[in-house]
Amino acid sequence: MLLVIDVGNSNIVLGIYDNERLVRDWRVSTDKSKTPDEYGILVHDLFRLAGIGFSDIKDIIISSVVPTLTGALEKLSRQYFGFKPYVVGPGIKTGMPIQYDNPKEVGADRIVNAVAGFEKHHCALIIVDFGTATTFDYVNKRGEYCGGAIAPGLMISMEALFQKASKLPRVEIAKPPAIIAKNTVNSMQAGIYYGYVGLVDGIVTRMKGEGKDNPRVIATGGLAGLIAPESATIEEVDEYLTLEGLRILYQRNRET
């Protein structure tokens, strides 16, 4: 079995593949203060509840945007599983040309998503990933990563509103009953929710106009399912896109 690990700023998503089949997945909070041993205990407990042993895992691949945790998880792999993991970054073969001023600047998660999306659809794509930051990535019809845009995530936007406006409460991110809201909580939700739908559709529309490839628009990330129903541009939500991309990259690098 293959263990894939996607380390984001807010969450770590783990998945276990048996060949091409995702058999289990978990989402846990990112904690930069945890040691390799503490993450080892966490993984052990998740595995135990799923009836999986460390010895069942034959390889590991990691995508991380948190450098301090990359090292911790590499150490976890060596100590608890007995081998060095694959880490998405320099030296990993993606099979995708990266048209970026400095390809090393592109977040690992963005490349993983692009690889998975093109492998699945074989057409031009815009991939919207709703994470701590929301990223918009453009892949052309030739399968080349062309770049994209980065915007503050929904949680960051809501937290900034709470912290900077002293009379406004912290509220749940949710679709409000109406855009013309009748109370403060719903008013904040309306501004954040519909403002974000407008942000997504606005950026996607501009990218479509600039790219001229008639791309398919895919959303992923924890809050994709909340925004997609009101979006005029998102065509598909794929919650496992990043995990699938890690599996594909593992296959490409194992075979070389």
From Swiss-Prot:
Record key words, sorted: ATP-binding, Coenzyme A biosynthesis, Cytoplasm, Kinase, Metal-binding, Nucleotide-binding, Potassium, Transferase
InterPro entries xref list: ATPase_NBD, Type_III_PanK
Residues given in the record as ATP binding sites: 6-13, 132
Pfam families in alphabetical order: Pan_kinase
Cofactor(s) named in the record: NH4(+); K(+)
Active site residues according to the UniProt entry: 109 (proton acceptor)
Binding-site residues for substrate, renumbered to this chain: 100, 107-110, 184
Compartments in which it is found: Cytoplasm
Catalytic activity annotation: (R)-pantothenate + ATP = (R)-4'-phosphopantothenate + ADP + H(+)
CDD domains: ASKHA_NBD_PanK-III (cd24015)
Superkingdom of origin: Bacteria
Binding site for K(+): 129
Cofactor, free-text remark: A monovalent cation. Ammonium or potassium.
Listed GO CC annotations: cytoplasm
Family: Belongs to the type III pantothenate kinase family.
PANTHER family: TYPE III PANTOTHENATE KINASE (PTHR34265:SF1)
Subunit structure, as described in the record: Homodimer.
Protein name: Type III pantothenate kinase
Organism annotation: Geotalea uraniireducens (strain Rf4) (Geobacter uraniireducens)
Gene label: coaX
